[in-house]
Regions:
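A single, central transmembrane helix in multi-pass transporters
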Residues: 4, 139-146, 186-250
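Intracellular helix-loop hinge segments at the cytoplasmic ends of transmembrane helices
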Residues: 7, 97-103, 217, 321-330
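Transmembrane alpha-helix termini and helix-breaking/packing motifs in multi-pass membrane transporters
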Residues: 11, 127-147, 221, 353-370
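C-terminal transmembrane bundle of multi-pass solute transporters/carriers
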Residues: 20-25, 34-35, 43, 47-49, ...
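Cytoplasmic helix-loop-helix junction between adjacent transmembrane helices
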Residues: 85-123
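Helix-loop junctions on the cytosolic side of multi-pass membrane transporters
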Residues: 151-173, 382
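Juxtamembrane intracellular "pre-TM" segments in multi-pass secondary transporters
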Residues: 167-198
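Positively charged, low-complexity/disordered segments
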Residues: 378-393
Length: 393
């Protein structure tokens, strides 16, 4: 959703800075409300709140679709709508992350459950970008936002139908929102496993994986080829290949047994994903405009990009699933919403980090920006090596 909003802005302005700004506005809005969302998840009925947030997302996306369809879109309007979507998502994500554990009766299946939950999300990463890239090429961006709006509406209806047994472990004494938020933060700060996993997750998404938000700029070189403008198709292919890699990683993770040291797997996959994204950015520097013009579909640039983004998707998916599994297994029930809400800021870092990435890309290039950002993350990894938490025990 943020990628296609970014593409709309990039098509209007041609600015990598504004492309990164749109994504970061969404991410910052999400981060601001994540803390509130975590407290709400621990205080109130999650299912009802999820229905409300799903309907709010559907209405907001419908407005964006109508604005785009009637050619009223401006950078300011898109940024405003993305900020609203970010605020809604900030409440929505902690609810989603904390509610699904209520559906698991046998906690020994939590690794497979987290992998399956992630698999559904990653599955949409395959269908949505692949179809979206080609749909945009032939029908434009409005149809994408209409479809997204319909998806959230269907989700709200499904939630109304689903029955589930909510956790009965609610805080008996309600404190202020600030005190309850600080309680979650203090817990993370004092627990080494939670502290290290969450910091690693933030750094990885903020410094390494935010390159995804610049895909519209990275594929800009395919606008002028002998086949015409195929940038949207290439964008769809790259995002879909990354999604296929992520699904593959989730399938691999679902086979992992609880007795295996999840801590070592988490850290190892984190390092590998950063290295692969570095080489993905490097592959986009190996460009020959003349060769891309004549043979875009078999160019060395596209071939290497596909390979690196596929394996980056695998390693990053394993990292995400293993890290979430460790947290879900260890978090106290009365703090689950707040702690997991703070962890979901991880996914906001993916978009928030795009602002700095976009600024670098504006003055240099998207490829150089991706390479330098992952190089910085590689240095941060040295600080992570002191932890090899078991997690799976």
């Amino acid at each position: 959703m943020t990628i296609y909003s970014g593409k709309l802005v990039f098509d209007i302005s041609g600015s990598e800075f504004l492309l990164g700004l749109v994504a970061s506005i969404f991410g910052i809005g999400t981060i601001i409300l994540n803390f509130v969302g975590g407290v709400i998840a621990d205080r109130f009925e999650k299912k009802i709140l999820l229905i409300i947030t799903s309907l709010a997302m559907a209405i907001t996306l419908l407005i964006l679709a109508l604005v785009d369809a009637f050619d009223y879109e401006t950078v300011a309007i898109i940024i405003t709508i993305c900020s609203i979507l970010g605020f809604i998502t900030g409440i929505d994500w902690p609810l989603r992350v904390s509610i699904f554990i209520d559906f698991i009766d046998d906690k020994s299946h939590i690794v497979s459950a987290v992998a399956l939950n992630s698999l559904l999300w990653q599955g949409m990463r395959i269908l949505a970008p692949g179809l979206g890239g080609f749909i945009i090429a032939y029908y434009g961006t409005p149809i994408i936002f209409f479809m997204s709006s319909a998806g959230f509406l269907i989700m709200a209806i499904a939630l109304m139908i689903i029955r589930y047994k909510p956790s009965t472990s609610k805080p008996k004494i309600k404190k202020s929102f600030l005190n309850e938020t600080m309680e979650g933060i203090y817990f993370i700060a004092e627990d080494k496993v939670f502290r290290v996993i969450i910091i690693i997750s933030y750094l990885t998404m903020g410094f390494a994986m935010s390159y995804l938000q610049l895909i519209p700029s990275l594929t800009d070189m395919y606008k002028n080829t002998s086949y015409g403008n195929i940038s949207s198709q290439v964008m769809g292919i790259l995002l879909s290949v990354g999604g296929i890699g992520a699904v593959t990683g989730n399938i691999i993770t679902s086979r992992i047994k609880n007795k295996i040291n999840l801590g070592k797997i988490t850290l190892g996959m984190n390092v590998i994903s950063v290295i692969l994204v570095f080489f993905f950015g490097l592959s986009n520097l190996l460009t020959s405009n003349e060769y891309i013009y004549d043979n875009p579909w078999i160019s060395l640039n596209l071939s290497l990009s596909i390979i690196f983004i596929f394996f980056a998707g695998i390693s990053n998916a394993i990292f995400i699933v293993c890290s979430i599994t460790i947290l879900q297994m260890k978090v106290p029930e009365n703090l689950r919403g707040r702690v997991m809400g703070i962890h979901t800021i991880t996914f906001s870092m993916l978009t928030a980090g795009a602002l700095v990435l976009g600024i670098v890309a504006e003055f240099l290039s998207s490829s150089i920006s991706t390479v330098s950002y992952t190089h910085l993350r590689a240095h941060e990894t040295r600080e992570d090596r002191g932890w090899r938490g078991g997690g799976g025990k």
